[in-house]
């Protein structure tokens, strides 16, 4: 019994010590991150870089371990990114915007907000250019708001329309003998469909084609307007898969 108590209290003491050390380490990281924050001086003829590989979330995202890794940069929220573009339009030290348009990690809604902000920025008569090596469709859609778009000659250019894919779990659930309790009303209520069907129902196919087609039509119209092209020409290029490389 005495040996058990000795081991127990020794383990408890070790746990307390490690907990206290952990708290001090976290506090130290916070203090270090706070002390590393400083104002950045912007020189004349500065260029605002919009990197589409950065996901602009709805809320501001901070890296709590940035002080340890040496990378204390924070990712601005979507609202902050839009405000930065708006501020750059009136900042005399900012000459223009450079868009890195390889892979756009932002959703359609965020992409639309950024694109709208860029179109407003262009009214300031400052330049907006975009460049990419492997350019995907949603990235080009945003970049179509730029004055000039450049693609690496040996790179890749994707242009093939829009599509959606759904994963169905009913077959797996049946094999595991799991019966989910699902409640829905109406044939167009498709949120629970992956758990009660093995393929898309006709109703879901119809509604998906409607909203996806509407989204695609809007995208084509805005790209055509920005690049001075015809929507029927863009649709034909996508349907035939005629564009695979920048040379195409």
Label the model's feature ranges:
Residues 2-231, 235-243:
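Small-residue-centered hinge/linker elements
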Residues 247-248:
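Long, low-complexity segments enriched in small/aliphatic residues
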């Amino acid at each position: 019994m005495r040996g058990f108590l000795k081991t127990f209290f020794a383990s408890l003491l070790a746990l307390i010590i490690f907990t206290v050390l952990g708290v001090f380490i976290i506090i130290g990281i916070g203090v270090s991150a706070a002390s590393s924050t400083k104002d950045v001086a912007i020189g004349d003829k500065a260029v605002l870089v919009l990197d589409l590989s950065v996901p602009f979330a709805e809320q501001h995202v901070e890296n709590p371990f940035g002080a340890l890794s040496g990378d204390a940069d924070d990712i601005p929220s979507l609202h902050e990114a839009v405000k930065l573009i708006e501020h750059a339009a009136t900042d005399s030290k900012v000459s223009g915007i450079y868009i890195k348009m390889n892979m756009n990690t932002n959703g359609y809604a965020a992409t639309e907000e950024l694109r709208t902000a860029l179109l407003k920025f262009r009214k300031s008569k400052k330049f907006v250019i975009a460049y990419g090596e492997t350019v995907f469709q949603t990235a080009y859609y945003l970049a179509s708001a730029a004055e000039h778009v450049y693609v690496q000659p040996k790179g890749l250019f994707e242009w093939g329309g829009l599509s959606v894919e759904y994963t169905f779990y009913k077959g797996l659930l049946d094999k595991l003998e799991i019966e989910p309790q699902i409640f829905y009303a109406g044939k167009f209520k498709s949120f629970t469909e992956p758990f009660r069907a093995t393929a898309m129902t006709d109703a879901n196919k119809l509604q998906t084609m409607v909203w996806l087609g509407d989204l695609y039509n809007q995208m084509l119209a805005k790209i055509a307007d920005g690049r001075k092209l015809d929507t029927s020409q863009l649709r034909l290029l996508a349907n035939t898969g005629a564009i695979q490389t920048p040379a195409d």
